[in-house]
């Protein structure tokens, strides 16, 4: 689950991670008032969307309007908010369609001596969280990892213990931090690692992390993703969910008990099993197609779920065809075939439909489909299915 920057900073503050004062607003007049509340000096107006790269992003109809604006008066704060609110902001992470800005964060400015990067993720290979820091703050970390990976420094830590002092000292030495700033870095990094564990995060990223002129380490950003599977332990965090920032199709799928992620391609996939679903997307790509989604109906899929799955897939305007790839195990092929027939009657298929069935009761399932009036293209294996759906949507 993602949250906005201003929400992340509220949580940071409660966890002892230093942040600057700021106010979330939804109108230009509120932005001007927020600027005055912050003391009437330098402030920053930031678009609040669930995507990074806002500082280099721009509004679709106004390329000069960036997603992060430095302001020096209430009038400038109001103008910046007017240029963002209700507009679509395009960043490196939103895609060309952009995301609508419905709120902005007006934050106090500060004396910046250095800009750094800090991020924490789970290293699945190492089975531990890993703290990553870099001297290249304010730059997309993906770019740093590709062009200058030697400037990213890592320290794994035990979630039951946290980050040790010697690890902080190692990182400070590599970052060139000493004196008062090193003491601030110890408090900051250890607090961030505790925050990551206590809140069941999948990722916590600050870019930029700054050292002020008086040696204090402060978070100028907050990008946080929580583990959805741990939300039962954090009922209060559910209140931070902004449904307007999430794909409607993904919300529908979640409600129906389906695992669905929307992608940018035009070949929709309906598969049972996460591993098989990923393999299906890979082989579509291998044969020249572009998958439109990840969709795992699970082992216990019923007719209602399959019907809703087709409604979701066919509601995508980019969908030019559907590949159904089922390996019958817990979910028998006859069950899926029956669900397909029911779905065709309720939804109607107006795009090519390629079906590959294998596993338990496969012959009976194929017979059911053959005797029905569902217009399908049969495939005998996954390669055959991928080739046929790519050809049908070309």
Curated annotation (Swiss-Prot):
Catalytic reactions of this protein: succinate + ATP + CoA = succinyl-CoA + ADP + phosphate; GTP + succinate + CoA = succinyl-CoA + GDP + phosphate
Q: Which cysteines are joined by disulfide bonds?
A: none
> According to the record, how does the cofactor bind?
Binds 1 Mg(2+) ion per subunit.
Record gene name: sucC
- Binding residues for substrate: 272, 329-331
Q: What are the top taxonomic ranks of the organism?
A: Bacteria, Pseudomonadati, Planctomycetota, Planctomycetia, Pirellulales
Species of origin: Rhodopirellula baltica (strain DSM 10527 / NCIMB 13988 / SH1)
One Pfam assignment: Ligase_CoA
Q: Could you tell me the Gene Ontology terms of the biological process aspect for this record?
A: succinyl-CoA metabolic process; tricarboxylic acid cycle
EC number(s) stated in the UniProt entry for this protein: 6.2.1.5
| Cofactor(s) essential for the protein | Mg(2+)
**Keywords linked to the UniProt accession:** ATP-binding, Ligase, Magnesium, Metal-binding, Nucleotide-binding, Tricarboxylic acid cycle
* Full protein name: Succinate--CoA ligase [ADP-forming] subunit beta
The record's listing under SUPFAM superfamilies reads: Glutathione synthetase ATP-binding domain-like, Succinyl-CoA synthetase domains
Q: Which family does it belong to?
A: Belongs to the succinate/malate CoA ligase beta subunit family.
Q: Which residues bind Mg(2+)?
A: 207, 221
